[in-house]
Amino acid sequence: APTVALLLLCALCSAADAPPPPPSAAASADGAYHAGVRPAPTPRDRVEVRVGLSLAQLVSLDEKNEELTTKVYLDLSWWDPRLQWDPHDYGGLGGLRVAASRLWLPDIGLDNNNDGEF
């Protein structure tokens, strides 16, 4: 029993010294982050989205039907001030990975697309 109490005490002391939990892109209890809201100070402000496209593979070229099939990597980047924090407040944590489904994402599409999928 004394060993269990000592281990429990050590665990509690470690938890007390731990930094606060890292910031999260998930909505907090007070609803501070909403993935459906554009990260702009006002509704009239623009969100600058930088777009990069890298060719990964040339799959096929059908000259008769004028179809080119490729595989590409799409790189989108923008600044969302709602997801910033001071790393010193979180034990030096400078970044974290969050599922894209939990973040605001720009509405990007390909206009000249043969099969309608992008």
From Swiss-Prot:
Transmembrane segments annotated in the record for this chain: none
Signal peptide extent: 1-15
GO molecular function annotation: acetylcholine-gated monoatomic cation-selective channel activity; transmembrane signaling receptor activity
InterPro entries to which the protein is assigned, alphabetical: Neur_chan_lig-bd, Neur_chan_lig-bd_sf, Neur_channel, Nicotinic_acetylcholine_rcpt
GO CC aspect terms: postsynaptic membrane
Catalytic activity: K(+)(in) = K(+)(out); Na(+)(in) = Na(+)(out)
Principal localisation: membrane
Subunit composition and interactions: Pentamer of two alpha chains, and one each of the beta, delta, and gamma chains.
Descriptive protein name: Acetylcholine receptor subunit beta
Gene name in the database record: CHRNB1
